[in-house]
Amino acid sequence: MVTIVLNKYKLLDKIHIGQQKLEDLLFNLKSEVKPIDENNIEIEINADRLDLLSSDGIARAIKGLLEKELGEAKYNVTDTEYTLIVDNVRTRPYALAAVVYNAKIDLEELIQFQEKLHGTIGRKRKKVAIGIHDLRKVDSKTIEYKEVPLSYKFVPLYENKELTISEILEKTEQGKLYGNISIANGVSPAIVQDDGEVLSIPPIINSNKTRLDENTKDFFIDVTGTSFEAVAQTLDIIVSNLAEAGGTIGRVKVLKSANFSQLSSPLFLHKIQNVREEYVKKILGIKTSKEEICKHVMRMRMNCDIENGVIRVTVPQYRVDILNEIDVVEDIAMSIGYNNLEPSKYISTNYGSYDYMTLLERKIRELGIGAGYVEISNFVLIKDEKLFSNKYVKILNPVTDEYNAVRNSLIPGLLDFLSKNQHAKFPIRVFETGDVVVYDSSTDTGFRNDKRAAYAIMDNKVSYEDIQAPIHYILKSLGLEVNYKEENNNIFIEGRSASIFYENEKMGVIGEVNPDVLIRFGIEYPAVIAELYISEIAKRLTNQR
């Protein structure tokens, strides 16, 4: 949620309703009003509704709900003589600009709007930075966005003397906060007049030359950043809300010096989103029609048409939160009012049941016990020195070094158990089922959870065949006719180990433990171990069902 503070009387005057009605309508827009004092209110707004971060944006939305204005808001747009030349700025390559004439907006609210955009779509100015200037104080019709050396001088905002950019970085609060974002190789991005005078060094600070005051009604707006889409969306939102305050939007010609491309800014990015009537009915659980759907869309300040039975929603430039069909459905719900959406009566009797993986794990445990093995249970955390693979999850701040990693196999835990129970009566037959975390480059984190089962035998004399027979019995009891392919790894004796396959899919490993591994764990007797991949087994058995 994003919090803004507004003068309630100024806001209510724009929409001509009472405070309680305002609170009710804002609740429909997933916003909450809290009084601060006699004059001011605090409004919590969903972070995706950037169009509501000023009183004019809120007024536009509420006029739609009141049906005073329907569909996309239309604004006066004119061409200007202003040109923005975008040079090769390596740290923030994208820039757009616009002019707004005769916008009647409170200065304090405008600054708040700017900073809230910085904190949301701007990612604290790392992605997008906004410069708003008093157009009367801009001397040049041609503005250039380029890199300048840190020795460049200008008077920064709220200062009374020239400073170099280096001094601004060292001495000003803005320089300390944002200087590391865009400064590189001894240069800084800058918005510069054709006479060389700096208007701003985004994303750090504006020049005091174009400082806004209470009499400012004409604005020059520059938006720079690392994402062209975010830059364009931000500028569209700003000029739309300023135009809602009575302003006229002026287009600025933007020239890209690197490839001589040209465009007119702002872009007024629109998109068409098709909406299915049945989908709306299913999600909201209501009876409706295409015409009724369009009516609600229009109340949410978007255009809607029905073409050949298809509902086509035109998403305007200020609604950057609408990404796909479900977002339009959510807007329809807001228009209807969440309190007016009654749950349908649904009578059903359902019974809980075990997850298939739980049932499979239980079956494997029963088969292990039936084969003469005793079940043990180790911790999921383990000492990293006991693991055989170097691809594992390391605990950043472990309470003890004994548990500083997440196990990626059950085998180390079984070997550790055997090392501590060499005094017990032979043969020792134990098994464990449980979770491990294994490396997987296809996942977002690089790792995934896996379910496994492992079996071990330790005796004065034990061989591969002693473990292979019960494992084959367990897998056959599950309905899997597997085969074994010789495969060597550092855990087992070469030539006395294999991988277990079912239809070319690896289901586990089996073998006689390498003497070097036994010495590493302090085990004085031979041992054999098998590990089954329950997750893979479950996939195969599920396909057979």
UniProtKB/Swiss-Prot annotation:
Establish whether keyword S-adenosyl-L-methionine is in the entry: no
Q: What reactions does this protein catalyze?
A: tRNA(Phe) + L-phenylalanine + ATP = L-phenylalanyl-tRNA(Phe) + AMP + diphosphate + H(+)
Q: Which GO terms describe its cellular component?
A: phenylalanine-tRNA ligase complex
Q: What is its EC number?
A: 6.1.1.20
Q: Name one Pfam family in it.
A: tRNA_synthFbeta
Q: Where in the cell is it found?
A: Cytoplasm
| Example of a GO biological process term | phenylalanyl-tRNA aminoacylation
Record key words, sorted: Aminoacyl-tRNA synthetase, ATP-binding, Cytoplasm, Ligase, Magnesium, Metal-binding, Nucleotide-binding, Protein biosynthesis
* Family annotation (CDD domains): PheRS_beta_core
Top-level EC class as recorded in UniProt: ligase
* Lineage: superkingdom: Archaea
InterPro entries (alphabetical): aa-tRNA-synth_II/BPL/LPL (IPR045864), B3/B4_tRNA-bd (IPR005146), DNA-bd_dom_put_sf (IPR009061), Phe-tRNA-ligase_IIc_bsu (IPR045060), Phe-tRNA-synth_IIc_bsu_arc_euk (IPR004531), Phe-tRNA_synthase-like_B3/B4 (IPR020825), Phe_tRNA_ligase_beta2_arc (IPR022918), PheRS_beta_core (IPR041616)
The UniProt entry's sequence similarity note says: Belongs to the phenylalanyl-tRNA synthetase beta subunit family. Type 2 subfamily.
Name of the protein in its database record: Phenylalanine--tRNA ligase beta subunit
